[in-house]
Amino acid sequence: MTSAIKPKAGTRPSKARIRQSFERAAPTYDDAAAIQRRICIRLAEGLPDIAPTHLLDAGCGTGYAQANLQTRFPDAHRVALDLSPGMLQRVATPCCRVAGDLEHLPLADSSLDLYWSSLAVQWCDLAVALREAHRTLRPGGVIALASLGPATFHELRHAFADVDDHRHTLAFHSPGEIRQLASLAGLAAIDIKKSTEIAHYPDFKTLLRAVKAIGANQLGDGRRTSLMSRSSFQLAESACEQLRTPAGLPLTYDVIYLYARK
């Protein structure tokens, strides 16, 4: 069977650009990643009752999940994998650290009991990443991942709608697409959950700086490649101000959680 879901070709930046972005973001990531930590905690809360002996933290970033995974599974051999060596250098919890690509895992077939990934697969060809997860999981092994859905950063799309025709966010898969791709990858007992997380910022510049600080400002084809004029920035800023709440300017994370078994 082949997937009816076309890869979002050209909508993701190159691996080199992703790596460079997260290399630059590594020093600021932890200070800016409050929502990312919250999502990681929610992902852990949904895990089934398992006792893995070998687990992978795929796209581990600075390793926030590692302390949680170590506490929960103290006897497991843990591999923390990320595309960015700079991120890996900041993983403090003792584990096996590996620089690698989620689409080409440097792991043997059927070597994992748990494939864990929080907010990393949105940078990948999801169909390929899920096939790699299936390949490396043992029979009965569990995948638990968090990704982002289509409503993510909709405020940015609103802000720039009348400014230009460039893309200002990644193209994200819907829950239905993620479910279908997981099934096509050979995964079973698929459970999809959703949550909405909203960050608030005092002004538009701070919002944009926060996106950059977590490395989420890289886009693929269709992105703006030239500097924005002052008038264009002010137009986007004015549009974003229309969305202001008493808490500040909102920025939405449309979070999708996938749990499944091989």
From Swiss-Prot:
InterPro entries: BioC, Malonyl-ACP_OMT, Methyltransf_11, SAM-dependent_MTases_sf. It is an enzyme of class 2 (transferase). Keywords: Biotin biosynthesis, Methyltransferase, S-adenosyl-L-methionine, Transferase. The keyword Transferase applies. It holds the Pfam family Methyltransf_11. It catalyses: malonyl-[ACP] + S-adenosyl-L-methionine = malonyl-[ACP] methyl ester + S-adenosyl-L-homocysteine. SUPFAM superfamilies: S-adenosyl-L-methionine-dependent methyltransferases (SSF53335). Disulfide bonds: none annotated. GO terms for molecular function: carboxyl-O-methyltransferase activity; malonyl-CoA methyltransferase activity; S-adenosylmethionine-dependent methyltransferase activity. GO terms for biological process: biotin biosynthetic process; methylation. Pathway: Cofactor biosynthesis; biotin biosynthesis. CDD domains: AdoMet_MTases. Its EC number is 2.1.1.197. Converts the free carboxyl group of a malonyl-thioester to its methyl ester by transfer of a methyl group from S-adenosyl-L-methionine (SAM). It allows to synthesize pimeloyl-ACP via the fatty acid synthetic pathway. NCBIfam families: BioC (TIGR02072). Belongs to the methyltransferase superfamily. This is Malonyl-[acyl-carrier protein] O-methyltransferase. It comes from Dechloromonas aromatica (strain RCB).
